[in-house]
Every structure is written in structure tokens, then in C-alpha cells.
């Protein structure tokens, strides 16, 4: 590891993650025209954001930076995969890792893995249906579309807010911060689908101001304690989301992890670490019995 990388990792442990993220969140919600217009223009130029696919192409039309960052796309910008039974990629970005969940652990990077149960808030009962299953980790870069969508149609069963650190999420931290995704703040969403239980985990990162879901709105930051929300079939209005429907969004960041049970899916050919992906593309197909 280079000296620059060592210094970066050292700073990750020393920086006040949540304070820094709150300050960035305050700036991202600032509506002062002179400030937000300059910030949005700089960001779009710095990260070469393609505004031609956005519903609102005019950078100055956004009321604040967060509105720009979580911008909606034009209808048809992400057509869903047409393969029968296709499991859709939940977000734009790149595959960080994907593969089998082995011995209750998920591969993070060479020499590193993390606990499935810890990812889900330390609940062995929640983890049980995914033991021996499969996972896919999608990293969203700053230039990407930052809404997360349903890989399959599903009915929400449970949501868990898991407090944690806010390490940056990138290749350097994945290779050098043990249990990275099981240490960062995250929101776990569990669904019942035609392929059995499915979990979509929204993982926060440094300067990620908040995570939202379409049914609960702002989920982070509440009090920094683990909190579980249960949604059962006896509820007056069960929460059901169709395949491809928006699930949630990040305000600055970061990573979405999708979990499936054993023998349910086979990942699409050609997918591997660092493969660029777009929301709606074929992530996996049903595994044949």
C-alpha cells in the first residue's frame, strides 16, 4: 500500500464521520442561489454528469444540491431487461463484488470478508434465509443516478436501521478497512418475492447526509441506535413494490447490497468486480431447479 493510501486510511479512522456528514448535509440543503448554483455547476463539471437523461436538465432549476443529486431520470432512460424472470440491477454504478455467501460471510475484497448476520444488524434469525445464498454489491459513484430500485417485485416485511461509522466506500477502503459494510451505518430492507426472501441493504458512507425510502421518508439520521420496523400482512395497507419501482435514495453516496436465498438466482454472464452497470439491466436470472 502506498504512503498516500496509508495516510487516507489513517484519516478515515481519525475524522469525525457523523459531524462531517452533518455539515455536508447542511450545505447540500442550502437554498441560497449564489451558493447552490455554483456548487451544482462545479460538481456536474468535476464528475462529468450527463444531464441529458435527467427530467430537469437545467442545473439552476434545482432548489438545492440534494435535489440535483437525487434527480429523477426521463421516462425510458433505464428500460428494464426483457429476459424472462430477470432480476434487475438496483442502481447505476459498478459491481464491487458478487457471488456466493459462504459460511455466513460475504466477500468484500482480497483478504477481507464480513459477517452476513452483522450486516443485517446482528440478527441471526434475519440472516438464516440467506445462508448459502448469493449477494451482489453495487457501488454508486458521485456522477451516478442515486436512486435505488427494486430488483424484483416484493412485499416489504421488515426494515432495520443499523447505526455505525461512516467510512468512505471505495476500492482503497474495501481493501483495507475490515468488515467495512458491516461497520458503516445502513438501512436493511427485507422483502418477500417470487424468488423467496430478498434483502436490499443501503449502506451509508463518509459525507452521506441521509438515506430515504419511499415508504418511510428520511430514515437516517435518527437517534444512533438500532431500530426495527415490522410490516406484516395484517397491516391495513401492505407495502408492495413492483419490479423496477423506486425503493429509496442516497443523499451523497454510496452502496447497495442485494441478498438472495440459496439456489434462487444465477448471476448474468460477464458480471464481475468493477463491471459497470445501470439500473434495470439484468443482474441475474432464476436458477433452474
Swiss-Prot record:
It catalyses: a 1,2-diacyl-sn-glycero-3-phospho-L-serine + H(+) = a 1,2-diacyl-sn-glycero-3-phosphoethanolamine + CO2. Binds 1 pyruvoyl group covalently per subunit. Is synthesized initially as an inactive proenzyme. Formation of the active enzyme involves a self-maturation process in which the active site pyruvoyl group is generated from an internal serine residue via an autocatalytic post-translational modification. Two non-identical subunits are generated from the proenzyme in this reaction, and the pyruvate is formed at the N-terminus of the alpha chain, which is derived from the carboxyl end of the proenzyme. NCBIfam families: PS_decarb. InterPro entries: PS_Dcarbxylase (IPR003817), PSD-B (IPR033177), PSD_type1_pro (IPR033178). Its cofactor is pyruvate. The keyword Lipid biosynthesis applies. Its EC number is 4.1.1.65. It is an enzyme of class 4 (lyase). The active site is at residues 92, 149, 254. Coiled coil: none annotated. Belongs to the phosphatidylserine decarboxylase family. PSD-B subfamily. Prokaryotic type I sub-subfamily. Pathway: Phospholipid metabolism; phosphatidylethanolamine biosynthesis; phosphatidylethanolamine from CDP-diacylglycerol: step 2/2. One of its GO terms (molecular function) is phosphatidylserine decarboxylase activity. GO terms for biological process: phosphatidylethanolamine biosynthetic process. This is Phosphatidylserine decarboxylase proenzyme. It is found in: Cell membrane. Pfam families: PS_Dcarbxylase. The gene is psd. Catalyzes the formation of phosphatidylethanolamine (PtdEtn) from phosphatidylserine (PtdSer). It is a peripheral membrane protein. Heterodimer of a large membrane-associated beta subunit and a small pyruvoyl-containing alpha subunit.
